[in-house]
Amino acid sequence: MEESEEPADAGQSLPPVYIYSPEYVSVCDSLAKVPKRASMVHSLIEAYALHKQMRIVKPKVASMEEMASFHTDAYLQHLQKVSEDGDDDHPDSIEYGLGYDCPATEGIFDYAAAVGGATITAAQCLIDGMCKVAINWSGGWHHAKKDEASGFCYLNDAVLGILRLRRKFDRILYVDLDLHHGDGVEDAFSFTSKVMTVSLHKFSPGFFPGTGDVSDVGLGKGRYYSVNVPIQDCIQDERYYHICESVLKEVYIAFNPKAVVLQLGADTIAGDPMCSFNMTPVGIGKCLKYILQWELATLILGGGGYNLANTARCWTYLTGVILGKTLSSEIPDHEFFTAYGPDYVLEITPSCRPDRNEPHRVQQILNYIKGNLKHVV
């Protein structure tokens, strides 16, 4: 793996907070789309002994009142009812986005409250000055709307985390590096100039959620405070980092954020079943380092990532980046060791698919964004 000359959190004496408890991991393991992913991620972090270099904080479960800081009472009450009954055929469920990619399985409300509470706990650690970086790898469910589940997301923990951080920090920057557009977070803050959302994502006809073109810039007082970077298939580390750094450099100057929420969905990584981008953890790690050098209060979230072993590889590598640690290439022996065959290494090799992002189109998008950011005051 790439060498780190100095810790990414150099100058920050406080260790990162790592949101974890066995109970929390067990609840997150139950999500049907990513079964046991939370355990795989934590076990690999533990196998590299990274947990010993972080402050482990047990998450609280979100209260109904905390969840209602964004979601409607009607949606939360319906989610709770179908969760208790395990009723996936309730006639009102379609209205609330439940079914198909968000099935109303038994216990889903408890899962949503656990994830929401974990991200709120992480945000509170930053508010309390307990750390400069707080990590909730099982968070980052960025598609949920205030009254609707969407795209495997039942509760928008990212929005709840931002709302909690707003109690202390005046201007919050949300950066979303998931394969999919962070539409739920953008929608939540599309009318405000206090939260800027930046999303790099695949934008292609028929690809979920279908929003996030470069011309989508926010509304009303929030006009120009939504930044969307549409990307085509097969992008690799070097070009992705060039785009990310170019955008974030301009965003930082224009917006002057006081805290950052960073969603690091691993469905961009080569080998993901989404079969779209062609990234490795090293490329995402460079983007992460760029943000960490601002030395702002930073809340780190997971998100997508459907090749479970590669997602664990990615988030473990990124945890190492946060700690300024170079990790051994060889996967240590641990509970899920056999999932990392046939090579049993931390590195992920990109495929040979050609990058479909034409340099002149990329430059057009960057110029458009730079022009829009001139309106940010």
From Swiss-Prot:
Phosphoserine, modified sites? S39
- Write out the residues that bind substrate: D101, G151, Y306
EC no.?
3.5.1.98, 3.5.1.-
Catalytic site: H143
- Which biological processes are named by the entry's GO terms? heterochromatin formation; mitotic sister chromatid cohesion
Q: Which domain of life is it from?
A: Eukaryota
* Residues reported in the UniProt entry to bind a divalent metal cation: D178, H180, D267
Kindly state which reaction or reactions the protein catalyses: N(6)-acetyl-L-lysyl-[histone] + H2O = L-lysyl-[histone] + acetate; N(6)-acetyl-L-lysyl-[protein] + H2O = L-lysyl-[protein] + acetate; N(6)-(2E)-butenoyl-L-lysyl-[protein] + H2O = (2E)-2-butenoate + L-lysyl-[protein]
Q: How is its activity regulated?
A: Its activity is inhibited by trichostatin A (TSA) and butyrate, 2 well known histone deacetylase inhibitors.
Name of the featured protein: Histone deacetylase 8
Name its species.
Answer: Bos taurus (Bovine)
